[in-house]
Amino acid sequence: MLRYILRKMISKKWLFIALLIGNILLTGIAASNPLYADAVMQRMLTDDMDAYLTKKNAYPGLVSVFFNGSVKKNGLIKENEALAHAVPADFGVPARMEVRRYFMSPIQNQPLIERDDAKISSIGLGALEDVAAHARIVAGRMFDGERRADGTVEVIVSQRALVELNLLMGERREFPKLTDADGQPIVIEVVGVYDVSDVEDPYWVRSPSSYKSECLLDFDLFNRLFVREDLPVALSGCWYELLDAEQMSARNAQALYETALKYQEMGKNRQYLTVTVAFSDILKNHISQARRVRVTLW
């Protein structure tokens, strides 16, 4: 039998060579198909992320952790900050940037120099970490990171806040019910008006105009003055974790989606906490599409 097969192979050697080459090519295609499929899946996920950015003008890798505080819950803000810090490690994706924001409920205040046109409205005080590196001062100057010798705290406002709150450059306002640790009323002075320095900067999850009722002061100074349990005003925090969307692997789409669901469920089960994962629906749709595409490729 073996001799018969050998004679056939010799007599029809070109046919057998063609079959051998065909088998080699078929094996190569079968071996490379998973790599090709992975590349297609990754391209699909990247395109979906780009489409989200174009359609919503918002960064697709964003995870927002929002703590809506109350006077009795002010001491929990650091606990929730630790939860936000764990987001990149839990998703297994490095963060391009983390933006920390602290703010308090609007508070009654009064101008130190009376104005005929003064509108006495409640004003919120807040802080954005590293805002000086991402903002452009359009009038006045950036705040100082320390209190003045007389206790005054320097703040900046958005152009909309300047109008909505009827504030003036150089104006000083006192907050009788908001005191420092020594019991002294907080006094602020508006020293600058800010806007974005780069419209494509992902740092500005919220545009300056959205801070229409809030004055911003130095982040570290805000921490020293107001991040304490005995603060007589509700203290809230928001942490924006901007995960690197380009490093999200399509191979891990299912695991990423399950982690997103875990965080969203955490926000539902914890009082005062809200968690939003911008790319959750992107991953959900990608997983569904990927199943159909893989069937086609195979």
Language model segments and positions:
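Membrane transport/envelope proteins' first extracytoplasmic loop
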Residues: L2-W298
